[in-house]
Amino acid sequence: MGGKTLYDKLWDDHLVQQRDDGSALLYIDRHIVHEVTSPQAFEGLRLAKRKPWRVDSVVATPDHNVPTTQKERASGVEGIEDPTSRIQVQTLDSNCDELGILEFKINDARQGIVHVVGPETGACLPGMTIVCGDSHTSTNGALGALAMGIGTSEVEHVLATQCLVAKKMKSMLVKVDGKLGAGVTPKDVVLAIIGKIGTAGGTGYAIEFGGEVMRSMSMEGRLTVCNMAIEAGARAGMVAVDDITIDYVKGRSFAPKGEHWEQAVAAWRDLKSDDDAVFDAVVELRGEEILPQVSWGTSPEMVLPVDASIPDPELETDAVKQNGMRRALQYMGLKAGQAIKDIYVDRVFIGSCTNSRIEDIRAAAEVVKGRTKAASVKEAIVVPGSGAVKAQAEAEGLDKIFVEAGLEWREPGCSMCLAMNADKLGDGEHCASTSNRNFEGRQGYGGRTHLVSPAMAAAAAIAGHFVDVREF
């Protein structure tokens, strides 16, 4: 019998029951909850007269609907102007209060984006099964965990039973060897991966990211890569546990302490694929061939190096892809053959669960330091992913660097990643965004999103158009 992949080990460790129809019951260790996908789940529990099976496994925080300006945040929940958004946050508060669920409320210093708060507090740990009613839950797989997004009915089911009905996926290894060049970031790595395999390339798979580049990558970088596994079509992404993982987790609020820490580390050391493990698919990239990336279309797979030009749909032989390219160019207001560097931006967004951690903030600050935002850029906002990130950045004086350069420093939240709060694009506006999705209308009706790294977004804010940050 061959060895096991990391995914095999995590699956087997949490398998409660294998069913004849191919589905299985998985035990869930950690359930992260936010205000958008939980109200109906809590109401379902209430109607069925059920209580959460393990209250101590649930951690909640509002993020999608929260305002990011200091003025609105000063009034707490009441400061949320949109009535629907306000009700969703209030409902989360009341449900958590009623059931005794730990919640980092809107003005709690620990509040933030669920996928930032989970790892940084130690609520999400290696070896866990982790679910949240949000597709980017895959982020937490960077810890050596099995982390998946679930729907609202599944949120209710996990609350009630501590189990999830799921079918085992196939396993894919995405191996990135070699070394990254200067100015090339984890965001560029994952965009390059998606550009290679497409947004359906990982469908039906759990992706393990490996190779020299991943082994040398910081934990925050790994979180960025696993965050966008879903954009490659995979429900889960993960990275094997190593010293970088353990050093990151040690000392965090919810991490084991003392003797329990030593026991945990001993167990976590096995959270890696065996040398003789066989994957269902293997994809290989070379780190030195990856350049700073910019998305040009309305799907994350429509991405190119910054020094490239927009492709011509007429040269595409696949009719479906050709039609998709034509529609994307029309929506984005771009032309085939146009240089990426000739795309001007109206707004810049540095934040989201993909790129709002302290390393991301530092990278952006390094680019804008001593420079001034281009007058043609209407707005450039920097939104830390959590209260902890915000406090750390301010302790380092990074907020002042942004403000002096003409960028806005905001409060934690999902912000302009999606049009569910006050931070939105106007119709036809182009945005250099460090988020994860560039779908039509994702950042606002008619908004045109270009996915980039924090450093590339910061450079665009200064230049007013896309530039190669390596030459900036």
UniProtKB/Swiss-Prot annotation:
**Is 4Fe-4S a UniProt keyword of this protein?**
yes
A Pfam cross-reference name: Aconitase
Is Cytoplasm there in the keyword field? no
Among the GO molecular function terms of this UniProt record, one is: 3-isopropylmalate dehydratase activity
Q: Where does [4Fe-4S] cluster bind?
A: C353, C414, C417
Annotated region (Disordered) at: 61-80
**What enzyme category does the UniProt record give?**
lyase
**Pathway involvement?**
Amino-acid biosynthesis; L-leucine biosynthesis; L-leucine from 3-methyl-2-oxobutanoate: step 2/4
Catalyses:
(2R,3S)-3-isopropylmalate = (2S)-2-isopropylmalate
Listed CDD domains: IPMI
- What SUPFAM superfamilies does the entry give? Aconitase iron-sulfur domain
Cofactor requirement: [4Fe-4S] cluster
Q: Which GO terms describe its biological process?
A: L-leucine biosynthetic process
User: Which keywords describe this protein according to UniProt?
Assistant: 4Fe-4S, Amino-acid biosynthesis, Branched-chain amino acid biosynthesis, Iron, Iron-sulfur, Leucine biosynthesis, Lyase, Metal-binding
Query: How and how many cofactors are bound, per the record note?
Result: Binds 1 [4Fe-4S] cluster per subunit.
State which Enzyme Commission number(s) the record gives.
4.2.1.33
Which Gene3D superfamilies does the protein's record reference?
Aconitase, domain 3
Q: What does this protein do?
A: Catalyzes the isomerization between 2-isopropylmalate and 3-isopropylmalate, via the formation of 2-isopropylmaleate.
Subunit structure, per the record? Heterodimer of LeuC and LeuD.
The protein's matches in PANTHER family, at most eight in alphabetical order, are given as:
3-ISOPROPYLMALATE DEHYDRATASE (PTHR43822:SF9), HOMOACONITASE, MITOCHONDRIAL-RELATED (PTHR43822)
Q: Which family is this sequence assigned to?
A: Belongs to the aconitase/IPM isomerase family. LeuC type 1 subfamily.
- This protein's name: 3-isopropylmalate dehydratase large subunit
Q: What gene, per UniProt, encodes this protein?
A: leuC
